[in-house]
Amino acid sequence: RLFTRLDLTSTKAYSLSDASKNLVKNLDDKFLVKAYFTAELPPPYNNNRRLLKDQLDDYRAYSKGNFQYELIDPSSKPEIEQEAQRYGIPPVQVQVVKDDKLQIEKAYMGLVLLYGDKQEHIQVVQNLDKIEYEISSKIKKLTSNVQNKIGLLSGQGEPEMEKIKQLQQLLTEQ
């Protein structure tokens, strides 16, 4: 069976970058993504599950069989909801119109990435424009044995760490 898909957008918005292709092509062991994603999401989220699946299919296609994923609907069973929450995937509230009434429902839109005994998660997939970067960053972090170090000098009028929260948060995530 031949898999092919054409991305006719000028920016190649629906294609993996060469860096992401090389990253999964060089996986030397099984890498699993568990995508906890509610099946029937209301607008504006209703296409996100399909678009995420397409992106994960691309990763798998370039991985020589080492990249696998599971697309799981946690709302189907309470034990699956609990599993998602154990992995750090919280439920989010979404607005749904049913019977001409606006209601709030619980939904899941998160990923857990597993490699060996290590794991990372993306708690809520909010912006699919950045999902390739987020997934590839997590893959690189999980598969890399190199731990970079950073040093900050102070005392020369630089802002204190408390004042540069964004940098601190970014470093914590790394």
Predicted regions and their residues:
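Short, surface-exposed patches at the edges or C-terminal ends of soluble domains, predominantly
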Residues: 1-174
